[in-house]
């Protein structure tokens, strides 16, 4: 769920998801128009694409369990949906950490109408 995703983002990046990522660029927090603005925004596109592979799941509301061992996120076994949601969220949090150097404050609260052009395919 968005609760666990938020915790993972804090643990991996040290940034609060709100406002850092909730309205970042063209893909973080919804909108999904135009090409990603940078590698951070591309992490959000990849996360959206991952969720698209889970049509029978409820990734924003299904709660799941995970733990951290030696600094790594471990998705705990539960239902197939919850495990797959956790893996999508983990991939996003790790991607955001790996791309912290591309994070640009000017893309926070980026107006969605500025996102123009063809949407990048998954």
UniProtKB/Swiss-Prot annotation:
InterPro entries: PLipase_A2 (IPR001211), PLipase_A2_Asp_AS (IPR033112), PLipase_A2_dom (IPR016090), PLipase_A2_dom_sf (IPR036444), PLipase_A2_His_AS (IPR033113). PROSITE patterns: PA2_ASP, PA2_HIS. SUPFAM superfamilies: Phospholipase A2, PLA2. Expressed by the venom gland. GO terms for cellular component: extracellular region. Residues 105-117 are annotated as: Important for membrane-damaging activities in eukaryotes and bacteria. One of its GO terms (molecular function) is calcium ion binding. One of its GO terms (biological process) is negative regulation of T cell proliferation. Keywords: Disulfide bond, Myotoxin, Secreted, Toxin. Disulfide bonds join 26-115, 28-44, 43-95, 49-122, 50-88, 57-81, 75-86. Snake venom phospholipase A2 homolog that lacks enzymatic activity. Shows high myotoxin activities and displays edema-inducing activities. Has cytotoxic activities against HUVEC cells (LC(50)=12.2 uL) and human lung adenocarcinoma A549 cells (LC(50)=8.5 uL). Belongs to the phospholipase A2 family. Group II subfamily. S49 sub-subfamily. Negative results: does not show antimicrobial activity against E.coli and S.aureus and does not produce appreciable hemolysis on human erythrocytes. This is Phospholipase A2 homolog ECS_00014. It comes from Echis carinatus sochureki (Saw-scaled viper).
């Amino acid at each position: 769920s968005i609760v666990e995703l938020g915790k993972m983002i804090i643990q991996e990046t040290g940034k609060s998801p709100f406002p850092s990522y909730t309205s970042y660029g063209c893909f973080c927090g919804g909108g999904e128009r135009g090409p990603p603005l940078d590698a951070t925004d591309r992490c959000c596109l990849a996360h959206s694409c991952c969720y698209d592979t889970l049509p029978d799941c409820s990734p924003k509301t299904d709660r799941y369990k995970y733990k951290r061992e030696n600094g790594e996120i471990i998705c705990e076994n539960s239902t197939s949906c919850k495990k797959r949601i956790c893996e999508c969220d983990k991939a996003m949090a790790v991607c955001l950490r790996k791309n912290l150097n591309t994070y640009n404050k000017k893309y926070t609260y980026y107006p969605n109408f500025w996102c123009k052009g063809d949407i990048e395919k998954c």
